[in-house]
A protein has these predicted regions:
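N-terminal hydrophobic signal-anchor/signal peptide
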Residues: 1-94, 274
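Hydrophobic alpha-helical segments characteristic of transmembrane helices
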Residues: 35, 41-44, 179-187, 228-234
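Short, glycine-rich, amphipathic interfacial segments at transmembrane boundaries or analogous
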Residues: 45-46, 51-55, 113-164, 223-244
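Compositionally biased, charge-rich terminal segments
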Residues: 69, 238-253, 274
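A hydrophobic, helix-centered structural microdomain
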Residues: 74-141, 186, 253, 258-274
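Short, well-ordered beta-strand elements within core beta-sheets of diverse protein domains
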Residues: 89, 168-176, 245-249
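A short, structured surface patch at a secondary-structure boundary
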Residues: 155-219, 259-267
């Protein structure tokens, strides 16, 4: 083949190789010496999907495969949006605290903030913060209420008229999503993003199957595609995974902005939140 390429008009060479055939390194080197462009189709790697890119890592040329390939500048813009949003959100969190803290102390003595270990990007644990909307024994009572869970298989927990929610103030801050505001601190720290996927608890994470884990291929978010798609009506965890996967595969700055605007609408109309 080298002799033919050497003596004939050849612009490019495309190698379509079955799995059992080794890459023809010598011919490719010869083509490189002659300045002829080469392409190699690797059948085994094609099964990994379309999101593949050749890049240099630590001096080695590698083929990287991911659920979504994004550029460095896109990640930078997303992080800058998170920082800006996190700063503004933390200011509002302080203002909200001034108003709800006294009521919380009267209705349910205890800390105003609630913290819990959640699983972040690629399974990295982090501590998430919220305004406490439930009574102090909420986690203990959760085990007793699992049979009333609306989500199948216990991969998430959601129930109608949850008795653990503090009467009055608890229902109000959950209905208006004010309980989520302390997460702006998580966003500022880099544990979370403005838009992403819901971070699971450790016990939920332990029950994940292989395809569930892809939800955490990105940073978890304060809001996301699932949250703005009528989350109160969704009771099948596989549907949650499908929406999260769709978001990750189609991610763009424009999609984030669209979800943020839709989130504002959902919060002010109260749709989708319970």
């Amino acid at each position: 083949m080298t002799a033919y390429i050497h003596k004939n008009w050849v612009d490019e060479v495309f190698f379509a190789l079955p799995e059992h055939v080794d890459i023809p390194k010598k011919i490719m080197k010869d083509c490189n010496r002659m300045g002829v462009v080469t392409h190699v189709q690797l059948a085994a790697l094609n099964e990994l999907g379309k999101n593949q890119v050749v890049e240099e890592i630590a001096g080695y040329m590698v083929l990287s495969s991911s659920i979504n390939i994004v550029s460095s500048w896109q990640l930078l813009v997303k992080r800058l949006m998170d920082i800006a949003g996190g700063l503004v959100g933390c200011i509002f969190t302080g203002i909200i605290y001034i108003f709800i803290a006294p009521i919380m102390k009267v209705k349910s003595p205890g800390p105003v903030f609630f913290s819990q270990v959640r699983m972040g990007k690629n399974g990295k644990p982090f501590k998430i913060y919220k305004f406490r909307s439930m009574y102090m024994d909420a986690e203990e009572r959760k085990k007793e209420l699992m049979e009333k869970n609306n989500i199948k298989d216990g991969l998430m927990f959601k129930m109608d008229d949850d008795p653990r929610i503090i009467k009055g103030i608890g229902h109000f801050i959950r209905k208006t999503s004010l309980d989520e505001f302390p997460q702006f601190w998580n966003i500022l720290k880099g544990d979370m993003s403005l838009v992403g996927t819901r971070p699971p608890t450790m016990d939920e994470w332990d029950k994940y199957e292989l395809h569930h884990r892809r939800r955490l291929a990105i940073k978890p978010g304060l809001t996301g595609m699932w949250q703005v798609s009528g989350r109160s009506e969704i009771t099948d965890f596989e549907e949650v995974v499908e929406l999260d996967t769709k978001y990750i595969e189609q991610w763009s700055i424009g999609l984030d902005i669209k979800i943020l605007f839709k989130t504002v609408t959902v919060v002010f109309t109260g749709s989708g939140a319970k």
